[in-house]
Amino acid sequence: MRIDGLSLDFFRNYVHLDAAFDPNINVIYGDNAQGKTNLLEAVAYLSGVSHRARYDRELIQFGVDHAFLKGNVFARERDFLLEAELHRGARRVLRSNGVKLKNGGELSGIFQSVLFCPEDLYLIREGAAARRGFLDDCICQLRPRYALALAEYKRLHEHKTRILRDSEEKPSLLDALDEFSMSMAKAGALLIHYRAHFIKRLCQAAPAIHGDFSGGRERLTLRYETVSTVTDPEAGPQVIFQQLLQHQEEHRAAEIASRQCLSGPHKDCLLYTSPSPRD
């Protein structure tokens, strides 16, 4: 897998850029604030997501209404032209070899990228939400089914939140609450299942690498914390689905009272410790 070329229009600080890359190692250098990190961000965006922008509109240059990215990549033993059109106030448009894609998960199924940057410290500083984002970014590139389930869960979560928020003025909205809870549990069960298995693999590889970085002075441990009724996050999605339904039923009254979604994997956390072996 490699990227051979990149074209940008109105992306971050680039009015226009055409770049070609060597198939081996490329060194990108320049003065501060010239756009080195923006260039790397654009490459990573071809996997479907920005590592630092919460909204796509943040990627569009100030004073214009759109931005375009094109990447020539080689993957799956063939060439791909990946394209992204970003518009203020409208959904982005993604294409692969001219064919419109449904979501960023389909991009990540073609081109997988790994980006290391100073902002990675946010995994430590920012807490559970940032770590969930890390899990989502990684697993979406590995499991297209996860990307679809994540997009569906986010859509359902947004709708259910709206129902709870507006139910005080329109109590009839609560008639749809159980249907949304069931659909969220179905999508959420897949998220928990895939997250648990990814973290299991991460636990097998990360401690040794972390130990090398710390010169053996620290020992990394990772633990996945999810909905309390889920007894085994590595179980099959159907088992987890039933346990999520139980948790949602137990929290139904509290959700209505607080007008918030209190139950589901949107509150998951990846916990870590890195003590000295002497501790």
Residue spans of the language-model regions?
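Amphipathic heptad-repeat alpha-helical coiled-coil/stalk segments that mediate oligomerization
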Residues: 196-270
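An accessory alpha-helical subdomain
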Residues: 122-214
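N-terminal pre-Walker A segment at the start of P-loop NTPase domains
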Residues: 1-15
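Nucleotide-state sensing region of NTPase/ATPase domains
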Residues: 47-130, 136-142, 146, 203-208, ...
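Conserved small/polar residues in nucleotide/adenosyl-binding loops
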Residues: 272-279
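Conserved P-loop NTP-binding catalytic core
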Residues: 11, 15-96, 145-146, 153, ...
